[in-house]
A protein has these predicted regions:
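Terminal helix/beta-alpha structural elements that buttress the NAD(P)+-binding lobe
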Residues: 2-28, 35-76, 81-347
């Protein structure tokens, strides 16, 4: 008999999540079924709750949101070779697609083998739940061929002699991006608030600048003097006015630095801000499941990196709820803003 599944359903735009029964789905040949023990909350979940199809036209109600899961494998598809029932895993769910079986906010989620990694016993499920979408978004921007196209991370790193700008180093995406870029052999220059300078340097950034400083762009341009730029990863938030400044700063830095003229955008942007000769593209963090970056990160790099402590769950989990019923309250905590933390719900 199949296990009994339950989900936190989004039944309409701008409506609270409603917990209720959900079908249990057996995996396809390349999928796992995971019994979720911790779920990460991302701002995109909150925005989809507010806007629904107005943001992503393919969203249909009722819908199961969520991208970050950590838990235990209960069933594997016929072609899966890396995992077996009982394995502890962290995986990226597909809560922004039409397929409700792959949303995170349920007891049992289906996830692709290509976006799942073994989780060492030394890392708790709550710690691991901060990773999946952050790692996926960072990796898509840094490594996909139609973005910055950096070389892939290795243990140990293979130095490239190039420097990349990661704007927003204390965010969950920034924390993942710094570690991935350093492991790929790049020097990282980043930004944060002054209270997080030590945190960002601890991730591997060689220099960190105050994003609120009136001279931050000029200071970063000066820091790139004599260096070969590998481009920039721009990480913003949900304040349009702030995002305009983030995009402009990153564009100005790559324009005035020697090297690659490209900004990978983890922020909504106006193409009019990007001058001729500079490339820019918005990042969809799930795209790596369909190309070589997915296995490069989730299979070949992340499991060993987590085991050896090369890659850390640096963003601290802020457990703001327990059970599927706690997700809506966790949304409210996340809306207030957190710094160098990510809101998590345990199951």
């Amino acid at each position: 008999m199949a296990p009994t599944n339950t989900a936190a359903w989004l039944t309409a735009a701008n409506s609270p999540l409603a917990v209720g029964p959900a079908p249990y789905t057996t995996p396809s040949p390349t999928q796992l079924v995971i019994r979720n023990h911790a779920l990460g909350i991302n701002m995109v979940d909150i925005v989809v709750q507010q806007l629904g199809p107005a943001l992503f036209s393919w969203i249909k109600f009722p819908h199961i949101l969520g991208s970050d899961i950590a838990g235990e494998v209960v069933e594997v598809g016929s072609s899966v070779t890396r995992f077996k029932p009982g394995d502890r895993v962290v995986a990226m769910a597909a809560g922004l697609t039409e397929d409700n079986t792959q949303g995170a906010f349920q007891t049992y989620s289906v996830a692709g083998e290509v976006v799942a990694s073994h989780l060492p016993a030394s890392i708790s499920y709550a710690q691991a739940a901060v990773l999946p979408l952050a790692v996926g978004t960072a990796a898509c921007g840094l490594f996909q061929k139609n973005y910055l196209a950096l070389q892939h991370p290795t243990i140990p790193p293979k130095p490239t002699g190039e420097t990349v700008l990661i704007w927003g180093g204390a965010t969950s995406v920034g924390s993942a991006a710094i570690q991935l870029a350093v492991a790929a052999g790049y020097e990282v220059i980043s930004t944060s608030s002054p209270k997080n300078f030590d945190y960002v340097r601890g991730l591997g950034a060689s220099a960190v600048f105050d994003y609120a400083s009136p001279t931050v762009t000029a200071d970063i341009i000066a820091a790139f003097a004599g260096k070969k730029s590998a481009g920039a990863l721009a990480i913003g938030g949900f304040d349009p006015a702030v995002n305009v400044g983030v995009v402009q700063a990153c564009v100005d830095v790559v324009v005035k630095s020697e090297g690659r003229k490209f900004v990978a955008m983890a922020v909504q942007f106006d193409p009019a801000q990007v001058p001729e000769g500079v490339g820019a593209k918005f990042i969809f963090g799930s795209d790596l499941k369909d190309n070589e970056v997915g296995p490069a990160i989730f299979e070949h790099f992340l499991p060993k990196a987590l085991e050896e402590g090369v890659f850390k769950c640096a963003t601290m989990p802020l457990v703001a709820g327990e059970g599927l019923e706690g997700i809506q309250g966790a949304f409210e905590v996340s809306k207030k803003g957190v710094s160098a933390q990510k809101v998590v719900v345990t199951l």
